[in-house]
């Protein structure tokens, strides 16, 4: 649909990473990752990554900023980013942050494998043990997206699951009863985290 309207398909692959899902192979033109999450793995660096396929045909009338870099051919978009974004905002990763991310990448495969298997086992246990709780996890056969996830994700279904427990009061009672997880608004950490999004990261969002 995006390409019909001459719009690049941009994918935020932060929660899956390239370990679980390779967006460029599935038709995305641009893939972005908050590398502060799973890629880093220890919550000690703020950074992001952008990967461009080089395949998208930028319409010069719709994207005059890109057209100015047409001499760079398929890499005109990257040239535009490097020339304007770096120059105007200084968006260049600090060496120490890059170093911390590289350390995290060395264990990315191992961490994702373990976190995904743990999430699946927990989701299955919750679904079987507490039928009154709605467990949303793409690795469950009862999930509406299971067949698509099974087709597209070859190494696991991610490390995030959500629960619907009936009310905000029930949600906080559950969080307060937990002993191992930390109550923090982050993902991709080596620690197990739990949060009530409606009261934190989505507090100012509309329904």
Indicate residue ranges for each PLM-predicted region.
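Conserved C-terminal alpha-helix-loop-beta "cap" of PLP-dependent enzymes
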Residues: 131-207
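Conserved PLP-enzyme active-site core in the AAT-like
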Residues: 1-130, 136
């Amino acid at each position: 649909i995006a390409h019909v309207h001459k719009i690049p398909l941009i994918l935020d692959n932060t929660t899956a990473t390239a370990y679980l899902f390779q967006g460029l192979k599935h038709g995305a033109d641009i893939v972005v990752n908050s590398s502060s999450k799973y890629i880093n793995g220890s919550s000690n660096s703020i950074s992001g990554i952008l990967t461009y396929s080089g395949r998208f045909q930028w319409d010069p009338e719709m994207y005059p900023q890109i057209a100015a870099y047409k001499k760079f051919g398929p890499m005109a978009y990257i040239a535009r980013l490097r020339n304007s974004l770096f120059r105007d905002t200084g968006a260049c990763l600090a060496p120490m942050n890059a170093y911390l991310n590289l350390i995290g990448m060395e264990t990315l495969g191992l961490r994702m494998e373990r976190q995904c298997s743990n999430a699946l086992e927990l989701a299955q246990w919750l679904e079987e043990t507490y039928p009154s709780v709605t467990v949303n996890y793409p690795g469950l056969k009862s999930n509406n997206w299971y067949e698509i996830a099974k087709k597209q994700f070859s190494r696991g279904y991610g490390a995030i699951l959500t629960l619907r427990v009936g009310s905000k009061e029930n949600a906080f009672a559950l969080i307060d009863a937990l002993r191992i997880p930390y109550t923090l608004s982050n993902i991709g950490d080596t620690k197990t985290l739990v949060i009530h999004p409606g009261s934190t990261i989505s507090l100012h969002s509309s329904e």
